[in-house]
Amino acid sequence: KVTTGDSQVMLALASGKSIRFEEAKTRPMGRTASGVRGITLQHENDEVIGMVAVNDMESNILVVSEKGYGKRSKLEDYRITNRGGKGVKTLNISEKTGDLVAIKNVDDSNDLMIINKSGLTIRMAVEDLRVMGRATQGVRLINIKDSDSIAAVAKVAHQEDADEVLEEGAEDAIEDGTENDTDTKENQE
């Protein structure tokens, strides 16, 4: 997502911490510059797992752990701080939840696609997830085996919206008389 210069930035760590700061606190730099510190890592094996550019202050923050737990929290639960700090707890990390693997900026008009490493993919409406406090464990979003973990999380357009667009496109094609203009296997045989 493109920032506006007035956006806010959120960074999240695998250890379950995140930080929110003003984009204006990072000065423009050249391509070869090493950058500035966004968040302080908790330990030597910690890593930044994601970044969100926040332009809509009414949106929610969704986080997902490697063992399929996740939650959605209000953006206002994360106070604005200076970049480079330790951050605040965004998910209660435990052996049950595993490390944090994804952070997304969502609202009720989004769906969530979750893929685990064994290839199972699920799609769920963000509006089905209740808003929870910032420092909670979350709820199980996907059942995974002990040896498996989450591979990827993506925010996509809400399914009903996609169906409506397809239906409108089909209606337009019928009105234009172009519904049979596409080459399908059946038409080619």
Protein language model annotation of sequence segments:
Residues 1-189:
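C-terminal interaction appendages of subunits in large macromolecular complexes
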